[in-house]
């Protein structure tokens, strides 16, 4: 059976009905039952960057339409995983410049199934009051990135924040005429964008961010279109150090560094997404930039390195403190 975006999303949302068998009655102590570490600290000069995990989903290899199944299975088995599905984390990032608190994306909230939506709890664990966040810089308007902008009551979660989004994404995802013409399985993406961004726009809390402009001093937008029309990366710079928060340049570090031309079905313009990915890989490998990715294994921070005619992902070493 072929996997479509519709069938994948339907199965993801249905996951909440799964039953679990407990072995607690036989155990001498109860199982803990969930992960503890979902925030990780990284420094960029005088700035502090906190990686925040929102959870993870499993994406079938079939969601990469141009991927060769045998080659994909070989790569995934070599990494110790299943050969036909990919655990895919969702990460957001909190940047403290010393003057401003800036969120890069916000996780999925309640919009993407039961295995996501942990961002708000992890932010609370850090002791961060949502009202203290000054700026939210969106990489793009997909629900696993903007869902956390609303609280559990569907209200604005960050009452004092200004939300920056690219003009291209705003015009595309909030356009009712475009939404009316897309296939039925794409319509929820448009509906959810209006539902979440709408309250911020009505409260005059949204602003357009352009390529090369700063959202705050030291955090600069970089256009990276293809995954969505206005997909945007953010270059965080302080004290001669740099971190490139690149959003959805990749969804699988294992597959797409080895095969940058394997697009995912969620790309709005696959050809442009591939061209952008290759350009960003070349830039980050050549300049030895540290990257932070929304769908790179948590904490999502590492490097792209050349590997023959392709590339590989090298995670940064975890550092205490």
What feature does the model see in each segment?
Residues 28, 117, 124, 128, ...:
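Metallo-beta-lactamase
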Residues 35-126, 233-250:
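Conserved beta-strand hairpin/beta-sheet module of binuclear metal-dependent hydrolase folds
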Residues 1-16:
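N-terminal secretory signal peptides and thylakoid transit peptides that target proteins
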Residues 2-4, 235, 239-321:
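Cap/insert and terminal regions of metallo-dependent hydrolase folds
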Residues 54-55, 106-109, 141, 168-169, ...:
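Active-site metal-binding loops of divalent metal-dependent hydrolases
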Residues 92, 114-164:
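Active-site metal-binding motif and surrounding structural segment of the metallo-beta-lactamase
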Residues 46, 95, 105, 140, ...:
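Divalent metal-coordination and catalytic microenvironments
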């Amino acid at each position: 059976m072929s996997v479509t975006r519709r069938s994948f999303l339907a199965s993801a949302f249905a996951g909440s009905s799964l039953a679990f068998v407990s072995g607690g009655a036989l155990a001498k102590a109860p199982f803990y039952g969930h992960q503890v570490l979902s925030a990780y600290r990284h420094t960029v000069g005088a700035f502090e960057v906190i990686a925040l995990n929102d959870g993870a989903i499993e994406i079938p290899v079939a969601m990469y339409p141009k991927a060769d199944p045998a080659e994909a299975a070989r790569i995934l088995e070599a990494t110790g995983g299943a050969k036909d599905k990919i655990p895919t984390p969702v990460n957001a990032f909190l940047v403290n410049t010393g003057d401003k608190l800036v969120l890069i994306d916000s996780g999925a909230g309640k919009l993407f199934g039961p295995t996501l939506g942990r961002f708000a709890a992890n932010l609370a664990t850090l002791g961060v009051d949502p009202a203290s966040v000054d700026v939210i810089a969106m990489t793009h308007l997909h629900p696993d990135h903007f869902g956390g902008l609303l609280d559990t009551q569907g209200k604005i979660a960050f009452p004092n924040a200004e939300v920056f989004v690219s003009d291209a994404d705003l015009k595309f995802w909030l356009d009712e005429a475009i939404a009316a013409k897309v296939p039925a399985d794409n319509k929820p993406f448009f509906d959810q964008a209006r539902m979440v961004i709408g309250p911020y726009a009505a409260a005059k809390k949204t602003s357009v961010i352009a390529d090369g402009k700063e959202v705050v001093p030291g955090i600069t937008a970089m256009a990276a279109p293809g995954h969505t029309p206005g997909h945007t990366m953010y270059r965080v710079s302080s004290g001669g150090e740099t971190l490139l928060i690149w959003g959805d340049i990749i969804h699988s570090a294992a597959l797409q560094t080895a095969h940058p031309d394997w697009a995912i079905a969620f790309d709005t313009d696959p050809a442009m997404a591939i061209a952008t990915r290759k350009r960003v890989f070349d830039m980050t490998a050549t300049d030895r930039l540290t990257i932070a990715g929304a769908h790179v294994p948590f904490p999502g921070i590492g490097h792209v390195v050349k590997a023959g005619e392709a590339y590989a992902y090298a995670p940064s070493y975890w550092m205490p403190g």
